[in-house]
Regions:
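Conserved, well-ordered alpha-helix/loop/beta-strand core segments that scaffold catalytic motifs
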Residues: 181, 186-214
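Catalytic domains of carbohydrate-active enzymes, especially glycoside hydrolases
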Residues: 24-49, 281-283
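Outer-envelope exported proteins of Gram-negative bacteria
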Residues: 44, 205-207, 211, 285, ...
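N-terminal regions that are enriched for targeting/export leaders
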Residues: 1-11, 27
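Alpha-amylase-like alpha-glycosidases and glucanotransferases acting on alpha-linked glucans and related
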Residues: 9, 15, 53-189, 214-438, ...
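Surface-exposed amphipathic alpha-helices with a cationic face
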Residues: 34, 192-200, 325, 349-350
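Structured C-terminal cap/extension of enzyme domains
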Residues: 446-505
Length: 509
């Protein structure tokens, strides 16, 4: 079935409290999607953010971001007063200020925690359900706060290396903070589950994003060092990244520790199966970031200042996904297969049967044989994007692309004026044979270059994009609905209205 989606992270939702929340504006956006004939909402990882504010560099592969917790729902539960949060200065409505959030959110959540009944049966059941990861995460965060946010590698050696007696003493000493971080996760997932249920009941599927790697300063590396290539002091032997290319002359040095794939193979990929089971339980579909890293991954010696020196090493390939399928059954997954894709990577993707990705912004650099041009799609089993969170907005792209790309795009799209290219690029994405077409919310809102979500290989100024409620008006909803009607991407229950709406487009054109 042909479908459409919009990519917008929770952080970008309209909100009066510094960042998007799992509250009223999230439900209103779901209503907007339904009204627009859109059946998919894609978000970025829900994980807590750390240094650099990236959801792809988190303290945990499982935890939810405390900043997204809706204060209004806590007030409704009698845990907060309205004045506890409503009168504060949350900064600009146009940009997320993560430093301000760090300073302001936790005292408010701590006040709600003090009023919370920790004997609540739902909370007790939540802790039991998530006992595989929650206790270690809560202790990790309690210790991090006790050490003024320092990385675990800077803690006392007996804590960094997880001496059993020292951990037990720390758990007793910081019991209130440990329980605080457990309660935060209970609130987060209670609100997330409620939102997901609402979306699903209204015909909207949620696509979540799973990074392939975890951060070095994460509870996984601290509590399960055997999963990674570390030395006896638990320092990385090598780290992840990408080799140099035309876009990045020195490559991309991500710095994530690499997996000990021999260990994972010996355990039957148990950790990965658990991680995939969790991801597919909180999302309807999971996008796996840097999928090519499962076939082969770029290894950079630890301590190197750039990614210029490194080597490709073999990953688990299809063995991991066969093990996951045997344990969990068929999973709703698609692969981020962008970048340096070899025949071996394509063979792995084909063997798994997962959809790959097509990005329209990449379509105009190599002439008529470019694989990202819709005419060259080989299968409907793919997801077509106007652009991803790592790309420029369409309006930004048309003023930043090379003259050669713009010239070809004009000829291909039969457009004379550069300013008309974004609309045509959106249309060919929707008109492609891809089963699912997704556009960045910025592209529907016709946002300029400074609305870009992330610029790879830059450390600051990313992940800050926000929207306002007035942007999601009836005019935009009608435009998106008509686009879906014209290109047969309406949900099945909306098909009967499609012919009428297509005629409206013809009349308006």
């Amino acid at each position: 079935m042909r479908r459409s989606g919009i990519l917008m992270h929770i952080s970008s939702l309209p909100s009066r409290y510094g960042i998007g929340k799992l509250g009223a504006s999230a439900y209103q956006f779901a209503d907007f999607l339904k009204k627009s004939g859109v059946s998919v909402w894609q978000i970025l990882p829900l994980s807590p953010t750390s240094y650099g504010d990236s959801p792809y560099q988190s303290f945990s592969a499982y935890a939810g971001n405390p900043y997204f917790i809706d204060f209004e729902q806590l007030e409704e539960q009698g845990l907060l007063e309205h004045t506890d949060y409503a009168d504060a200065n949350w900064g600009s409505p146009n940009k997320v200020d993560y430093e301000r959030l760090y300073q302001m959110c936790f005292p408010i959540l701590k006040k709600a925690f003090q009023a919370f009944d920790r004997t609540n049966p739902d909370y007790v059941a939540f802790c039991e359900k998530h006992r595989a990861w929650l206790p270690d995460y809560a202790l990790f965060m309690a210790l991090k706060f006790a050490h003024n946010g320092k990385a675990w590698t800077e803690w006392e050696p007996e804590l960094a290396m997880r001496n059993a007696e020292s951990l037990q003493k720390a758990r007793s000493k910081y019991i209130e903070d440990v329980q605080f971080f457990q309660v935060i996760q209970y609130w987060f997932y209670s609100q997330w589950d409620k939102l997901k249920t609402y979306c699903n009941e209204n015909g909207i599927s949620l696509i979540g994003d799973m990074p392939i790697y975890v951060s070095y300063d994460s509870v996984e590396v601290w509590s399960q060092p055997e999963l990674f290539e570390l030395d006896r002091q638990h320092r990385p032997i090598a780290v992840a990244g990408c080799p140099p290319d035309v876009f990045s002359p020195t490559g991309q040095l991500w710095g994530n520790p690499l997996y000990d794939w021999d260990y994972h193979k010996k355990t039957g990929y148990a950790w990965w199966i658990q991680r995939l089971a969790f991801a597919t339980s909180i999302y309807d579909t999971v996008r796996i970031d840097h999928f090519r890293g499962f076939e082969s991954y770029y290894s950079i010696p630890y301590g190197n200042p750039t990614a210029e020196i490194g080597e490709w090493r073999k990953g688990p390939n299809t063995a991991l996904f066969k093990a996951a399928q045997a344990a969990l059954g068929d999973l709703s997954i698609f692969a981020e297969d962008l970048g340096f894709i070899t025949p071996e990577v394509q063979k792995m993707l084909d063997a798994c049967g997962y959809p790959g990705m097509k990005v329209t912004q990449f379509a105009f650099s190599d002439g008529a044989k470019n694989t990202y041009l819709p005419q060259n799609y080989k299968t409907t089993n793919c997801v077509a994007y106007t652009g991803t969170h790592d790309n420029m907005t369409l309006n930004g792209w048309v003023y930043g692309a090379s003259d050669k790309e713009i010239s070809f795009a004009k000829r291909y799209l039969r457009v004379r004026d550069r300013k008309d290219l974004p609309e045509s690029m959106l249309r060919i994405t929707w008109g492609s044979i891809a089963d699912l077409a997704i556009g960045q919310v910025q592209d529907f809102l016709q946002e300029p270059a400074n609305a870009r979500m992330n610029t790879p290989s830059t450390a600051f100024g990313n992940w800050q994009y926000r929207t306002t409620a007035k942007q999601f008006n009836h005019k935009l909803s009608k435009k998106i609905y008509q686009l879906n009607a014209l290109y047969n991407r309406l949900p099945e229950e909306e098909d009967s209205a499609a012919e009428t709406d297509t005629k409206e487009i013809e009349q308006e054109d």
